[in-house]
């Protein structure tokens, strides 16, 4: 039985990973919050990855670290962003060395590439981070590979993770809620922006595959199909038998962005293919809005 530490375990992705891995592994979860908020039964330790002394006191040895902890913000001048996503990465790498960790799985962000210029998007797509947040995620990739060695690090570049715990102000829960309540959709531009959504349960499955294969390297972890905003709205309307209408207004500065993602490398080296359809995920999210 492997001993696996998950940072940011209370988050959207971290909690899904813990839920899947619990049955076959000893899971230790850590997050900044005082209490375990996942509803799952595992050893939970409150810890802040920016505090190296506290981090070094976590259990040792550890077989695998799944690093989910991160600050997500559009504030390019946020000190917390740098402290968590950069200094926190260095501290986590130091702990990994001291804990004799065999492999570290880092959840990165596919949008570090900036505007997609080559589709489908592969792992060799040029990198052009559009914000400081995305710069910190790319820093995380490079720093971990440098500090631990490329053969010990698995990087997952993820597009748009979704699940039942997705924040209610995000586009997918908003669309689902609108459809259920027969509220009209207001979409910027012509709704042509194409996005890739992946269920957090599939991300957890990808983590499990990487652990089993004892892999290393950079992998796009995405679903098989991408959808425009217009297609997503139409899908919600049809799925929930809604009378909602679609209205178009304003400008979408990313109207021509196409997040069409190649997962060939993950299929070939990890044996991973996304299982959950967008319809299944939308139905799962809808449970938040149905009495």
Task: Give residue ranges: language-model regions.
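Flexible, glycine-rich beta-alpha linker
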Residues: 113-114, 128-131, 154-171
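Active-site Tyr-X1-5-Lys
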Residues: 115, 128-154, 180
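N-terminal Rossmann NAD(P)H-binding glycine-rich loop of SDR-like oxidoreductase domains
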Residues: 4-23
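NAD(P)H-binding glycine-rich loop region in Rossmannoid oxidoreductase-like domains
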Residues: 49-84
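NAD(P)-cofactor binding segment of oxidoreductase domains
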Residues: 65, 76-104
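C-terminal substrate-binding subdomain of Rossmann-fold SDR/epimerase-dehydratase oxidoreductases
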Residues: 179, 183-291
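Glycine-rich NAD(P)-binding loop of the Rossmann-fold in SDR/ketoreductase-type enzymes
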Residues: 50, 80-91, 127, 131, ...
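Conserved Rossmann-fold NAD(P)-dependent oxidoreductase catalytic core, especially the SDR/UDP-sugar
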Residues: 91-132
